[in-house]
């Protein structure tokens, strides 16, 4: 079973979304642990709640500091806690580009509108003034542009005829408390999701020259060459033949390399029951910590072992430049 993801939450005030995430983390099947709650306001009410729940806290005021300097202080605290993801929960600071880059694809935010509508402030009144029938909230990845990152999930909230900004905000907040923990859990556990893992392999395998996908004994495999005479260079395996792991099968140069890999890192590599005797190696991908650059390298290496010479010659020539 994969280790739980480690997250840090940034707040500036009472932290109601923080509280929802904290209480969700108490469930035994929650895929994340909260390592730190940090704030730019030492008096933020949410810090007291986090402390009461035995969660480490950190605070450092931003006044008198450049945006970059304060972000670096926060970054250092997050890294020091061991967190792998940053969750913004009412953190009222525009983050520097450098901070955003450091946490690219590992930082989430929740926004009280159905993005891309109504980025920024006053979202409730803007939705009412526009005559919208529904408003809502969105969880998205954080990018350099405000409220512009890829949307991971949304919840619609009906706008009632007598709604004002406050009444609408109170119902959207309830939706936020449901949406944020659920979306966070889904996102941090995606690397253990077989469908997500398969798509990562597929994208990388099909990016190689003259490749195509074909089922083999019910499992997706990738071949190089023509439909009739192509050769397999990789397979996806999902707990087949009594094996417990989700993995990628690739070719090695032979028994010596296979044995060396198994001896050097038995937690990563294993001998597949079906093709192990043929010199193939399996790489575990359901640990939640897959190194996808490493996987790309293996796919390329395995591809070169079976690709037609005309293709490998082209690769060799290209590598000279």
How would you label these PLM feature ranges?
Residues 1-45, 49:
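N-terminal Rossmann-like dinucleotide-binding module
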Residues 6-8, 33-36, 83-86, 244-248:
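Short active-site oxyanion
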Residues 24, 32, 85, 89-192:
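Donor/substrate-binding cores of folate-linked one-carbon enzymes
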Residues 39-40, 63, 67, 81-97:
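N-terminal glycine-rich "phosphate-gripper" loop used for MgATP/nucleotide binding
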Residues 53-54, 103:
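Short, structured coil segments at secondary-structure junctions
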Residues 58-63, 110:
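Short beta->alpha connector loops at strand-helix junctions that form conserved
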Residues 72-80:
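Short, well-structured alpha-helical segments in soluble
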Residues 192-321:
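Charge-dense, helix-prone N-terminal extensions
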């Amino acid at each position: 079973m994969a280790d739980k993801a480690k997250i840090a939450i940034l707040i500036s005030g009472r932290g109601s979304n923080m509280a929802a995430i904290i209480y969700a983390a108490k469930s035994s099947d929650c895929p994340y642990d909260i390592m730190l709650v940090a704030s730019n306001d030492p008096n933020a009410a949410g810090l007291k709640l986090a402390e009461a729940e035995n969660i480490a806290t950190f605070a450092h005021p931003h006044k008198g500091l450049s945006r970059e300097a304060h972000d670096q202080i926060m970054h250092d605290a997050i890294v020091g806690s061991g967190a792998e993801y940053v969750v913004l929960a009412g953190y009222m600071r525009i983050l520097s580009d450098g901070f955003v880059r450091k946490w690219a694809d590992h930082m989430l935010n929740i926004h009280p509108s159905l993005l891309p509508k109504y980025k920024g402030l006053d979202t409730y009144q803007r939705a009412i003034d526009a005559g919208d029938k529904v408003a809502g909230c969105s969880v998205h990845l954080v990018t350099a542009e405000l409220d512009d990152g890829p949307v991971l999930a949304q919840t619609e909230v009906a706008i009632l005829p007598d709604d004002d900004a406050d009444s609408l905000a109170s119902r959207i907040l309830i939706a936020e408390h449901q949406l944020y923990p659920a979306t966070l859990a889904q996102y941090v556990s995606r690397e253990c999701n077989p469908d997500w893992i398969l798509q990562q392999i597929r994208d990388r395998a099909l990016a190689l020259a003259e490749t195509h996908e074909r089922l083999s004994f019910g499992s997706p495999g990738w071949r190089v060459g023509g439909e009739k005479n192509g050769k397999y260079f990789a397979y996806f395996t999902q707990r087949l033949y009594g094996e417990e792991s989700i993995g990628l099968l690739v070719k090695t140069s032979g028994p010596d390399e296979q044995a060396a890999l198994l001896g050097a890192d038995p937690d990563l590599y294993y001998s597949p029951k079906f093709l192990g005797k043929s010199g193939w190696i399996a790489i575990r991908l359901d640990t939640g910590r897959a190194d996808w650059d490493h996987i790309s390298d293996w796919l390329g290496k395995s591809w070169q072992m079976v690709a037609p010479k005309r293709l490998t010659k082209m690769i060799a020539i290209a590598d000279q430049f």
